């Protein structure tokens, strides 16, 4: 279930505009609540989509919210979601 969502538009080095949607996700796994993230981009010129999710991240909602804000601040794209999460949490 999506519990928070933010959307922005970014432009790459080739002047392509991308709509980027960030989701904070709550999942029940074996009666445990786990929080994770998904990032979805849509290329505005050709409507191609790229989607990546990382669901099994933390049980701590406040920590998940903090990381969610950092994803948005750093304009993280689906291709580098896992790598950026590794950098943020280390």
Each language-model region and where it sits:
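Negatively charged, low-complexity tracts enriched in Asp/Glu with abundant Ser/Thr
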Residues: 1-23
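Generic marker of residues within folded, mature protein domains
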Residues: 12-14, 27, 54
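A positively charged, amphipathic N-terminal helix/segment that binds anionic biomolecules
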Residues: 18-29, 82
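A short, structured beta-strand/loop element
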Residues: 29-52
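Mixed-charge, Lys/Arg-enriched low-complexity segments
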Residues: 45-90
């Amino acid at each position: 279930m999506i519990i928070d969502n933010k959307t922005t538009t970014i432009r790459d080095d080739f002047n392509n505009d991308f709509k980027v949607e960030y989701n904070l996700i709550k999942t029940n796994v074996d009666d445990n609540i786990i929080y994770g993230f998904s990032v979805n981009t849509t290329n505005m010129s050709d409507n191609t989509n790229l989607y990546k999710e990382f669901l099994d991240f933390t049980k701590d909602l406040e920590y998940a919210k903090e990381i969610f804000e950092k994803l948005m601040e750093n304009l993280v794209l689906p291709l580098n979601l896992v790598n950026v999460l590794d950098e943020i949490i280390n």
